[in-house]
Amino acid sequence: MNVMRRLKSIASGRTSISSDPGVDSSLKRPKLDQDNDNLSSRGDDPMQVDQSTDMVVVSQDTVAGTSNVPPPPDQLPEVMNDMRLREDEPHANRGEEDKDMEPPIVNGCGTETGQVITTTVGGRDGKPKQTISYMAQRVVGTGSFGVVFQAKCLETGEQVAIKKVLQDKRYKNRELQIMRLQDHPNVVRLRHSFFSTTDKDELYLNLVLEFVPETVYRALKHYTKMNQHMPIILVQLYTYQICRALNYLHRVVGVCHRDIKPQNLLVNTHTHQLKICDFGSAKMLVPGEPNISYICSRYYRAPELIFGATEYTNAIDMWSGGCVMAELLLGQPLFPGESGIDQLVEIIKILGTPTREEIRCMNPNYTEFKFPQIKAHPWHKIFHKRMPPEAVDLVSRLLQYSPNLRCTALEACAHPFFDDLRAPNVSLPNGRALPPLFNFTAQELAGASTELRQRLIPAHCQGTGNSS
């Protein structure tokens, strides 16, 4: 069933949102298990036919030339109708100015268990050169970009993650350039980097990262397997740290992550400190300069991207963060679209049909496009009856059609949903102290009003140097 028929069916009441155990609403379960934690990716032929839908699959280069002329009413815009978004390839589009390099999956080349990799670090800024050896232990993720494996530093015994990607010798690696700028408790840390070569004269970039053993995706799966909801204190902790990290990335580093999802959120299950990882899709967004719209994994993709917007903003990360928060509350994705186009249907089923002004804010080229009128589904019916109203309110503020109406990351951090974290004697479920939450730097708070600063930093932490 195509998008227009599905939407008209919903609008006429023939299709309803079915109930799901544990929630008051209609959220269909995704058919695909997303257990390809953070790094799996599938290579599609640039032009092929999806046999199940007769839908042509096109590469981003094909769609990049799509006309900006709006389609006639009751006809899907070409950018939505004549292609399937490459939602399973979040890494295939990284570096559009790098000629859309799609490196193959690495086989071997230093990733075999027990193999030792030796490199030299230092030698800059007065630091002496130092030889460091790593023993590969196990592969923790693979994809079209390369491979990530866990390794042990033989000199110190420290566990690290090494992300190994094929490097085009003609270009600098954007991910490396961005990671060198970053230093934040909620962003995975780059230890150092080095290049390696193969017998085929292939050049590989190796990013040595701090190793964090768990992902938010797997942490949530732990609860859903037991038919339980994640404790609200953990939802608060994880969502807060996502927002704090995004504020740092957006305001201090000046980059948009463009692939926020549970698989790209690392978490220490003892301290519950969260760190955003995988900056292979990240980019500094420059106003007026176009960007690819085929970015971000499907369930977490902002609607302006589905509409083919190329001059989007950091607000796409806030939409993704809202989707992650809703998923933590529900135990399953809020918008489980089965294709790029179905993703829009899932959004409309809950948010209702976007107004002409909302469509203009997402992509001004499609203001004349007419959708069947579907009423918004009340947010309080999406979640179970005992859900804190503050949680529902924050989700609704993040999941706005209009990018400029979404909370900024710093505004989200100050939301009342996180007031429990600011209480003087709050602790983790295991009795431990909370991870550092309020040790903001001057750069993180730059431009924030006095009122906002007072909301962000609890009274018992102000002026005390208390970092938690």
Curated annotation (Swiss-Prot):
Alphabetical UniProt keywords: ATP-binding, Kinase, Nucleotide-binding, Phosphoprotein, Serine/threonine-protein kinase, Transferase
Tissue spec. comment: In developing pollen.
Binding residues for ATP: 140-148, 163
GO molecular function: ATP binding; protein serine kinase activity; protein serine/threonine kinase activity
InterPro entries, per database record: GSK-3, Kinase-like_dom_sf, Prot_kinase_dom, Protein_kinase_ATP_BS, Ser/Thr_kinase_AS, STKc_GSK3
All copies of domain Protein kinase, residue ranges: 134-418
EC number annotated for this UniProt entry: 2.7.11.1
SUPFAM superfamilies reported in the protein's UniProt record: Protein kinase-like (PK-like)
Uppermost EC category: transferase
PTMs per UniProt: Autophosphorylated mainly on threonine and serine residues.
Residue ranges of the TM segments: none
Renumbered residue ranges of the record's region Disordered: 1-53, 91-112
Catalytic activity: L-seryl-[protein] + ATP = O-phospho-L-seryl-[protein] + ADP + H(+); L-threonyl-[protein] + ATP = O-phospho-L-threonyl-[protein] + ADP + H(+)
SMART domains: S_TKc
Record flagged with keyword Calcium: no
PROSITE patterns on file: PROTEIN_KINASE_ATP, PROTEIN_KINASE_DOM, PROTEIN_KINASE_ST
Active-site residues, Swiss-Prot/TrEMBL: 259
Keyword Phosphoprotein: yes
Location of Phosphotyrosine modifications: 294
A Pfam family reported for this protein in Swiss-Prot or TrEMBL: Pkinase
Family recorded in the similarity comment: Belongs to the protein kinase superfamily. CMGC Ser/Thr protein kinase family. GSK-3 subfamily.
Function recorded in the entry: May mediate extracellular signals to regulate transcription in differentiating cells.
Protein name: Shaggy-related protein kinase theta
Species of origin: Brassica napus (Rape)
